[in-house]
Amino acid sequence: ETVPYMFEN
């Protein structure tokens, strides 16, 4: 499971 906010960080 991947989350978008982790990429933006």
Curated annotation (Swiss-Prot):
Subcellular localization, as worded in the UniProt entry: Periplasmic flagellum; Periplasm
Principal location listed in the UniProt entry: periplasm
Highest taxon in the source lineage: Bacteria
Alphabetic keyword roster: Bacterial flagellum, Periplasm
GO-annotated cellular components: periplasmic flagellum
Record field: transmembrane: none
Subunit structure: The flagellum consists of an outer layer composed of two sheath proteins, flaA1 (44 kDa) and flaA2 (35 kDa) around a core that contains three proteins flaB1 (37 kDa), flaB2 (34 kDa) and flaB3 (32 kDa).
Function according to Swiss-Prot or TrEMBL: Component of the outer layer of the flagella.
Name this polypeptide is given: Flagellar filament outer layer protein flaA2
Source organism per UniProt: Brachyspira hyodysenteriae
Lineage: Bacteria, Pseudomonadati, Spirochaetota, Spirochaetia, Brachyspirales
Gene: flaA2
